[in-house]
Amino acid sequence: MQITVREALRDAMQEEMIRDDKVFVMGEEVAEYQGAYKVTQGLLEQFGPKRVIDTPITEYGFAGLAVGAAFAGLRPIVEFMTFNFAMQAMDHIVNSAAKTHYMSGGQVRCPIVFRGPNGAASRVAAQHSQNYAACYSYIPGLKVVAPYSAEDHKGLMITAIRDDNPVIFLENEILYGHSFDISENVEPIPFGKAKVLKEGDSVTIVTFSIQVKLALDAANILQSDNINCEVIDLRTIKPLDIDTIIESVKKTGRLVVIEEGWFFAGIGATIAAIVMKEAFDYLDAPVEIVSGKDVPLPYAVNLEKLALPSEYDVINAVKKVCYIK
């Protein structure tokens, strides 16, 4: 059976709303319009306006309302039309949601999911194309999820909704319409468990979200040069499954990390630092990081393409760590 990513997300929310009447959805256009990307399609009709709530265009306002509801024992799912707009709500996310469990000595929980599209789409320009994966991963108290397949979106969303503290669920606008095979019964997927999508012994490629497709496509091309790539989908960035990465590096001796976001202070840099510390003796080459260029993402289609990681970039990075010209 195949379903799209948007259907997988909708199904996860629907099932959890049936299972637990404390779960509700709120955000801009999630009810009457059924979501800017139709992820909440059918939920208003099924659960009514008290549990599927349209909000004004005020991320700071409704994020704060949702955090307060979570403190009171409800389980809000907050949809941001894009995580670029979540910048308006950073105080509530970083200072209220992420900190209160610690600052209350464990007395106050904040079971909330912040979800929506993150990163580049297609010609939506610099203010609507930013990738916040590294930004949120930097904050203690937040879990950060960035799946690729439909099944992982569903299983990880179920886990996120059931979590007793805040989860940042980073989706991708382009992936919403992609179809994937999915199991008949999808179980919750634990956080911090990466997935090896392709086994190999030449080089380890680590990535997440839509860049998984880029990694798999590049790996298939490199196969013709007898370079067997092991491709790892992180699925969750925080907690990070460093054990799976290190076990792979012990086998391959080489590591390439792909991320759509910028290089400086990025996820690739963090993974490289950990691997250099924990598995230095197993490395046969310096770690390579393929990332977005250090510019605001352009609107022009030719410049946008140049600013984002490409198959060419990945293939070159893999050949570099394999010392192949």
From Swiss-Prot:
<dbReference type="InterPro" id="IPR027110">
    <property type="entry name" value="PDHB_mito-type"/>
</dbReference>
<dbReference type="Pfam" id="PF02780">
    <property type="entry name" value="Transketolase_C"/>
</dbReference>
<protein>
    <recommendedName>
        <fullName>Pyruvate dehydrogenase E1 component subunit beta</fullName>
        <ecNumber>1.2.4.1</ecNumber>
    </recommendedName>
</protein>
<dbReference type="GO" id="GO:0006086">
    <property type="term" value="P:pyruvate decarboxylation to acetyl-CoA"/>
</dbReference>
<keyword id="KW-0786">Thiamine pyrophosphate</keyword>
<comment type="subunit">
    <text>Heterodimer of an alpha and a beta chain.</text>
</comment>
<dbReference type="InterPro" id="IPR005475">
    <property type="entry name" value="Transketolase-like_Pyr-bd"/>
</dbReference>
<comment type="function">
    <text>The pyruvate dehydrogenase complex catalyzes the overall conversion of pyruvate to acetyl-CoA and CO(2). It contains multiple copies of three enzymatic components: pyruvate dehydrogenase (E1), dihydrolipoamide acetyltransferase (E2) and lipoamide dehydrogenase (E3).</text>
</comment>
<dbReference type="Pfam" id="PF02779">
    <property type="entry name" value="Transket_pyr"/>
</dbReference>
<dbReference type="InterPro" id="IPR029061">
    <property type="entry name" value="THDP-binding"/>
</dbReference>
<keyword id="KW-0560">Oxidoreductase</keyword>
<keyword id="KW-0670">Pyruvate</keyword>
<feature type="binding site">
    <location>
        <position position="59"/>
    </location>
    <ligand>
        <name>thiamine diphosphate</name>
    </ligand>
</feature>
<dbReference type="InterPro" id="IPR033248">
    <property type="entry name" value="Transketolase_C"/>
</dbReference>
<dbReference type="GO" id="GO:0004739">
    <property type="term" value="F:pyruvate dehydrogenase (acetyl-transferring) activity"/>
</dbReference>
<dbReference type="InterPro" id="IPR009014">
    <property type="entry name" value="Transketo_C/PFOR_II"/>
</dbReference>
